[in-house]
Amino acid sequence: MTNVFTIDAFREEVKKKYEPVTIGISEDVTVELKPLLKLGQKAREAVVEAVKEVEDIPDIDEDDEEAEELVDEYSLRICEIVAKVFRLIATKPKKLIAALDEEEDPRIRAELYATVLRTWMVETQLGEAAPSPS
């Protein structure tokens, strides 16, 4: 069985990398999240650093007596870090952050922040580089 690739399919994938991700805040307010490829070098580096910072937050041991306290602390930390990313990639970062901050529960708020970030990362994903011919 042979896989057939079309130029149109390639074109769609390539265009997707350059298109913003649109997040609806309300019926009449949307925020666009710029793709990584359209950011300047310093902004790209800051985004990558922030994502690494989130990934470096340690897992919480459920048996730890301070686990409940740590969950809230880590949740707030995640929101702070991801907000930095939104300030770099969003057309209206204050509106996006304000909408996410309406959630009072720090755990749910952190999950909302992470979901928006994850959606942006998936939708604008660069993918793996093709192996070089040898």
UniProtKB/Swiss-Prot annotation:
InterPro entries: Gp24/Gp25. This is Tail assembly protein Gp24. It holds the Pfam family GP24_25. Disulfide bonds: none annotated. It comes from the Viruses. GO terms for biological process: viral tail assembly; viral translational frameshifting. Belongs to the L5likevirus tail assembly protein family. It comes from Mycobacterium phage D29 (Mycobacteriophage D29). Interacts with tail assembly protein Gp25 and tape measure protein. The gene is 24. Promotes tail assembly by creating a scaffold for the tail tube proteins. The tail assembly proteins Gp24 and Gp25 would wrap the linear tape measure protein to create a tail assembly scaffold. It would allow polymerization of tail tube protein during which Gp24 and Gp25 are released and therefore are absent from the mature virion. The tail assembly protein Gp25 is produced by a rare -1 ribosomal frameshift. The ratio Gp24/Gp25 is important for proper tail assembly.
